[in-house]
Amino acid sequence: MLIALWLGAHATAAATVTTIRFSLDRAIDGAAAPFVLAASKGLFRTENINVTMDSAAGSQDAIRRVAAGEADIALADINALIRYRDREDAVPVKAVFVFYDKAPYAMIARKSRGIVTMADIQGKTVGLVEGDLAMRLWPAVAKLNGIKSDKVKIEKLSPAVREPMLSAGQVDAVSGFSFLSAINLRNRGVPANDLVVLRLADFGSEVYGHALIVNPTFAANHPDAVKAFLRATIAGVKLTLKDPSKAIDDVLAKMDGASRDLELERLRASIADNIVTDEVKRNGIGGIEAKRFAAALDQIADDFEFRQRPSLADIFDEGFLPAAGARKIN
């Protein structure tokens, strides 16, 4: 009788499902496939977590949601998190998993405007969206590549006109995500052979990209649920890598009238350039190397004055990561 009661209680505890409010940094597109698959293929459910998913209006909004307790976990730019954490009133939100080992920041330019490599940016006009972190890292990249920042004319734009202005030739280049703006421009009719994507990571930028961030109260109260979310995310990444073409079908079901070819290209670009990097192949997905993090902080400091320079432990908590073997990506 007692054994039966214990077994029943144990089974009930084991089956307890934790709800997680998850926020992407923007509307779903092809690059979100690992998270979409984790939901649609039951990977979250297998981990005894019930995940609700919505979208923020950029990384700063995603961080705000997590800090305010409106979301438990979110995908956000770790560089935006670093800047946020330097605020005196910052909630101690931390990243627990790096999704983009290389940040997708890039200069997207047209060859017909005389730009084929990063050095050609000097003397040109670059369209910049207010708050775009790509340009906040520009001083460090310019210095590394011998470019005089004061010789680059900055034109401030709204997000809605970034691609149209480059398409119309009103600016020579725009800053943005490599797998967003470049593919969007092709969709606007700009010939692929006239576009050049200058990824800042290819020109010396050391910063990491997007990461999963967690509300500190939720992390303290539900550590096993956070670990379960990371395991399901890794499973979603692996399933996506196995067959990107199949994965994109699940994404398209969540979008309205999107182009299959463009979203598949977006997914493949994010995989090749940002997720499956040489560092990830060596060490597995999700972690941070202390030496590279320190170098990234140095580069951020070229355009940002820290009140107090953070330590790696201030920004990233590796305690929720699965063992390295479980994070290996083939």
Predicted segments with their positions:
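Secondary-structure end/capping motifs
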Residues: 220-303
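Surface-exposed patches in mature extracellular/periplasmic domains of secreted proteins
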Residues: 54, 93-95, 154, 240-251, ...
